[in-house]
């Protein structure tokens, strides 16, 4: 089975098939609106992947720029933007810690299930990598703007849990001044077969088996929302 890192590099279409099923109740957009207005905002989406957040936000904001280190993910993102008929978007390969943008050029930075990888993929230097990222956010955001992060608190869980591989990341967010709350972002699939197949593809056999055992056409997921004003 491919790792998640390998999936991001090579499996854009299959990954999008999964992500398109997420948050069937629309809680992500609702949570964002509770934190900050969206209208007339310039938004940067970091680790945008296939455009889960960027494509959702584009109809509501002035301009959105999607950044990701994977050209494969951005290929799908661009296809979705083009199909939408919208023109207020741009998608570019870039690292969270070094964005190809001017100082004080955005009103909102969002990132879904992505900034955490700076900690996960850099176990020996996770704190300094996160500090580099936060410094870059302070550079690119206008005064009194917001960073909003969405991170996992358990897929296949009805109640939120702290994931072991993010044990350093969660308290770091608290230490640097992020507020947080919990939302549900459940996946709603077209069939039980699809639910099992896509869950197994990305999350692994343990969750795939759980979906099959519980006959989950709707896969529960808890997501943490962290936000900070700059």
Regions found by a protein language model. Give the residues of each.
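Conserved Class I S-adenosyl-L-methionine
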Residues: 50, 181-230
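A short glycine-rich, Lys/Arg-flanked "PGG" loop and its adjoining helix->strand segment in the class I
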Residues: 127-143
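A short acidic, Gly/Pro-enriched loop at the edge of an enzyme's catalytic core
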Residues: 97-109
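Residues that mark the start of a beta-strand
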Residues: 41-42, 142
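Conserved class I S-adenosyl-L-methionine
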Residues: 1-39, 146-171
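A short SAM/SAH-binding and catalytic strip from SAM-dependent methyltransferases
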Residues: 108-128
